[in-house]
Swiss-Prot record:
Transmembrane segments: none
PROSITE patterns listed in its UniProt record: G_TR_1, G_TR_2
Entry function: Promotes mitochondrial protein synthesis. May act as a fidelity factor of the translation reaction, by catalyzing a one-codon backward translocation of tRNAs on improperly translocated ribosomes. Binds to mitochondrial ribosomes in a GTP-dependent manner.
One cellular-component annotation, GO: mitochondrial matrix
Subcellular location as annotated: Mitochondrion inner membrane
A Pfam cross-reference name: LepA_C
Protein name (record): Translation factor guf1, mitochondrial
InterPro entries in the cross-refs: EF-4, EFG_III/V, EFG_V-like, G_TR_CS, LepA_C_sf, LepA_CTD, LepA_IV, P-loop_NTPase
Keywords, in A-Z order: GTP-binding, Hydrolase, Membrane, Mitochondrion, Mitochondrion inner membrane, Nucleotide-binding, Protein biosynthesis, Transit peptide
Residues noted as binding GTP in the record, renumbered to the chain: 75-82, 139-143, 193-196
NCBIfam families: lepA (TIGR01393), small_GTP (TIGR00231)
C-alpha cells in the first residue's frame, strides 16, 4: 500500500505526459524469467518493430560473406592457446588490453586447473587493407579426453592455427590434433609460441613440424602470446591463407574429409538452415544454443522448427559471442552466434547437438545437415548423493551439465548400500574428474563417486554379444561356466612422447601394465615417439600419473581406440560378514585381483565402526576369498561381578557370551555409515 501511495505522489509531481506514457506501457518485472512470460509479452517480442542498430551491428552488417573467416587454435595442453586467444581479442579491440587472463576459459574448473576443457567461441572485427573482416575464433581443448569438443569445433571452421611450444616441440596431442584437422580438410598455419623463453628452440620446433607433418614452414609465424611479440602478424595471415568458404559438418557414420566448396557456403536469400553446435543452461534465459547459420537468416520473434524432434519454438533473442553474449537484430548465413527461445525448451534433451533448424513452413524446402559423429563413453563411474533426500537436486544438476557436454552418458542405478544414483559414462578419467568438479562447484552437489571402470564385452555361447558397463550385470559363476564363451576387454593404441633418457623406464612401465610395443622412432636425436597397445583398464588406473613420475613430468600421452581382445576378466567383490557390498564391486583383470583385494580390506577396515559382534571383511572372486581383515567386537567383562568363584562358573559364563556373539553375528546387521563409503571411495 505504501508503495502505491509513493507511486501516486510521484506521478502527480511528474511533468505532463509522463504519467500517460507510463500507464500505456506494459508493466514487466525486471527479474521475471523470459521463458515464462505471458502471452501478451510474447506477442510483443514477436512484433516486427526494430531497434536502432548499434555501431557494432552496423559494421557487421556491412561485411559481405566473402570477408568472413572462421578459424580455431589447436595445440597440445599448456602450449598457450588461451593466452594467444587473449592477445587476438585485444588486438581486434574486442576486449580491453592489460588485465586479461584466459578470457575464453569461462569455467571455474578451467581457471583452477589451467587447462581448457570446453571449446569457446568469439567473434571479432579486424580491418585489413582498409576493409573490415568478420573473424570467428574457437579456442579448443588440448587434452585427448575432450576430443569431441575439438571435432565439433572444426565443423565451424575453414582453417586452424597449429600452435607448438618452442621449448617443448611437438607433443603427443599435437600429433593427434594435426591428423584430426588434416582429415577434415582444414587449412593449417604453423605457429611457434613462447619464443621469448630462454629454453626456446624455434628452429628445432619448425624442423619437427616440417618432418612430421610435411607442412610448409617458410611462412610460419614466431610469436610470444605472453608478451604479444609478432601476434599482429597472425590475423593478416589468417585472412590471406584461410578460405572464406567453410565446411559441412562430419557425417554421423564416417569420419571422411569434409565437403569443400569453391565458393562460400551460405546464401542469405535461401530458407534458413541452422546447425546446433553446442548448448548450455542459464538460470534466467533457460537453454541457450550456439548455432552456425548455413543459409538464410534468423531474427528474434521468428518461429523455427527442429528436424530431429519436430518441435517448434519462437526465438527470444539472437546474437554473437563478443566475447560474452551480445544481442544482434539478425544472424546471417556464414555467422556463428547464439539464440534462446521464448518460451524456452521444456526439457534439456530437446537440444540435440548436430540438429538442423529451419523456419516453420520451409521444412520440405530445406535438406537437414548430416550432424556429428557421436563419441563413445569408455570410462564409467557410479554417482550417489551423500544425502538420499538430495537425489532430485543431483539429477537436475547432472541434466544441466550434460546439456553442455553431450559426450556423457547417464543411466539411473540403485545400490542397496548407497541407494538411488546414476551410472555415468565419460571419454576418459580427466573428463570424469572435471565433471565431478563442476558438479560440486557450479551446483553445490555433495556426491559419492566410485572408482572408474571400463566396459567389457560378453560373448555368449549362443553367439550373442553384450557390452557390460556395470558390475551388477556381470554374469555369476555358474552362468560364466555354462553360458559364456569368452570375455573381451577394450584396448587402446597409446602414443607416448618423451626425452630419450627415460626410454627404459617408460618401456618398463608399459610392460608392467600388460602393454605390447608397436613402434619406436626418434623424431629428433633426443625425443622419442613410442607406441604401445595397452588395455584401457590399465590406462584409467592412474597410468598417466605413473608416466609423469617415471619421466619427471616430461612425457605426454595420447591414445585412440584399438580393438577388443580376450582377457581373463573377473568380478571382484567386497563382503562384510559374507554379504556383498554392491557399491564397491569392480570388473577387473585377474592379474589385479590380489593387489586390489588386499587394498580394499585394509582400507575398508579403517572406516567400519566396531560392533557388539565380530565383523569379517573379505575380498572375493566368486567363492574364492582373496584377502581378509577382522574388526574385533566390543568386549563385555562378564566376570566382573565374580570374585572368588570356582573355575567352572567362569567357564560357563564365557561359553554363554561366546554363543551370544555367534547368534548376533548370524542375525545382526552391520551398520556402515555413508561417510564410511565416502572415505573408502575417496581418491
Amino acid at each position: 500500500m505504501r508503495g502505491c501511495l509513493q507511486l501516486a505522489r510521484w506521478l502527480s509531481a511528474a511533468p505532463k505526459g509522463t504519467a500517460a506514457s507510463l500507464t500505456r506501457a506494459p508493466f514487466v518485472l525486471a527479474n521475471a524469467p523470459r521463458y515464462f512470460t505471458s502471452s501478451a509479452s510474447r506477442a510483443g517480442s514477436r512484433s516486427t518493430a526494430t531497434k536502432p542498430l548499434s555501431d557494432l551491428e552496423k559494421r557487421i552488417s556491412a561485411i559481405p560473406i566473402e570477408r568472413y573467416r572462421n578459424f580455431c587454435i589447436v595445440a597440445h595442453v599448456d602450449h598457450g592457446k588461451s593466452t594467444l586467444s587473449d592477445r587476438l581479442l585485444e588486438l581486434t579491440g574486442t576486449i580491453e588490453p592489460g588485465s586479461n587472463k584466459q578470457v575464453l576459459d569461462k569455467l571455474d574448473v578451467e581457471r583452477e586447473r589451467g587447462i581448457t576443457v570446453k571449446a569457446q567461441t568469439c567473434s571479432m572485427i579486424y580491418n585489413h587493407n582498409g576493409e573490415d573482416y568478420l573473424l570467428h575464433l574457437v579456442d579448443t581443448p588440448g587434452h585427448v579426453d575432450f576430443r569431441a569438443e575439438v571435432s565439433r569445433s572444426y565443423a565451424s571452421c575453414g582453417g586452424a592455427l597449429l600452435l607448438v611450444d618452442a621449448s617443448q616441440g611437438i607433443q603427443a596431442q599435437t600429433v593427434a590434433n594435426f591428423y584430426l584437422a588434416f582429415a577434415q580438410g582444414l587449412e593449417l598455419i604453423p605457429v611457434i609460441n613462447k619464443v621469448d623463453l630462454p629454453s626456446a628452440e624455434p628452429e628445432r620446433a619448425l624442423e619437427q613440424m616440417k618432418n612430421s607433418f610435411e607442412l610448409d614452414t617458410e611462412n610460419a609465424v614466431m610469436v610470444s602470446a605472453k608478451t604479444g611479440l609478432n601476434v599482429e602478424k597472425l590475423l593478416p595471415t589468417v585472412i590471406e591463407k584461410i578460405p572464406a568458404y567453410g565446411h559441412f559438418p562430419v557425417d554421423s557414420h564416417e569420419l571422411l574429409p569434409l565437403l569443400t566448396l569453391s565458393s562460400p557456403i551460405g546464401d542469405c536469400k535461401k530458407p534458413l538452415r541452422m546447425l546446433l553446435v553446442d548448448s548450455w543452461y542459464d538460470s534466467y534465459k533457460g537453454v541457450i544454443c550456439l548455432v552456425r547459420i548455413f543459409d538464410g537468416e534468423i531474427r528474434a520473434g521468428q518461429q523455427v522448427v527442429s528436424f530431429a524432434t519436430g518441435l517448434k519454438y519462437y526465438v527470444g533473442e539472437a546474437g554473437i559471442m563478443y566475447p560474452n553474449e551480445t544481442p544482434q537484430s539478425v544472424l546471417r548465413a556464414g555467422q556463428v552466434g547464439y539464440i534462446y527461445f521464448n518460451p524456452g525448451m521444456k526439457r534439456s534433451k530437446e537440444a540435440k547437438i548436430g540438429d538442423t533448424f529451419t523456419r516453420v513452413g520451409f521444412e520440405k524446402a530445406v535438406e537437414p545437415l548430416p550432424g556429428f559423429e557421436e563419441p563413445k563413453a569408455m570410462v564409467f563411474v557410479a554417482a550417489y548423493p551423500v544425502d538420499a533426500d538430495h537425489f532430485e537436486h543431483l539429477e537436475d544438476s547432472i541434466n544441466q551439465l550434460v546439456l553442455n557436454d553431450r559426450s556423457i552418458t547417464v543411466q539411473k542405478e540403485s545400490s542397496e548400500a548407497l541407494g538411488a544414483g546414476f551410472r555415468l559414462g565419460f571419454l576418459g578419467t580427466l573428463h570424469c574428474s572435471v565433471f565431478e568438479d563442476r558438479l560440486r562447484q557450479e551446483h553445490g552437489a555433495s556426491i559419492i563417486i566410485t572408482p572408474p571402470s571400463v566396459p567389457v564385452k560378453i560373448i555368449w555361447k549362443d553367439g550373442k554379444e553384450e557390452i557390460i558397463t556395470s558390475p551388477a550385470k556381470f554374469p555369476e559363476d555358474e552362468e560364466l561356466r555354462s553360458k559364456v564363451a569368452e570375455i573381451q576387454e577394450p584396448y587402446v593404441l597409446a602414443t607416448l612422447t618423451f626425452p630419450e633418457e627415460y626410454l627404459g623406464k617408460v618401456i618398463e612401465l608399459c610392460e608392467a601394465n600388460r602393454g605390447e610395443q608397436k613402434s619406436l622412432e626418434y623424431f629428433t636425436p633426443t625425443q622419442v615417439i613410442l607406441k604401445y597397445e595397452l588395455p584401457l583398464a590399465q590406462l584409467v588406473d592412474d597410468f598417466f600419473g605413473k608416466l609423469k613420475g617415471s619421466t619427471k613430468g616430461y612425457a605426454s600421452l595420447d591414445y585412440e581406440e584399438s580393438a577388443w581382445q580376450t582377457g581373463n576378466i573377473v568380478k571382484l567383490q567386497l563382503l562384510v560378514n559374507k554379504a556383498p557390498v554392491d557399491a564397491v564391486a569392480r570388473i577387473v583383470h585377474s592379474s589385479q585381483v590380489e593387489r586390489l583385494g588386499r587394498q580394499w580390506v585394509t582400507k575398508f577396515k579403517e572406516h567400519v565402526d566396531r560392533q557388539l559382534f565380530e565383523v569379517v571383511i573379505q575380498a572375493a572372486v566368486g567363492k574364492k576369498i582373496i584377502a581378509r581383515e577382522t574388526v574385533k567386537p566390543y568386549r563385555k567383562d562378564v566376570l566382573a561381578k565374580l570374585h572368588a568363584s570356582d573355575v567352572s562358573r567362569r567357564r560357563k559364563l564365557l561359553e554363554k557370551q561366546k554363543e551370544g556373539r555367534k547368534r548376533l553375528r548370524a542375525v545382526g546387521n552391520v551398520v556402515i555409515e555413508h561417510k564410511a563409503f565416502q572415505a573408502f571411495l575417496a581418491k
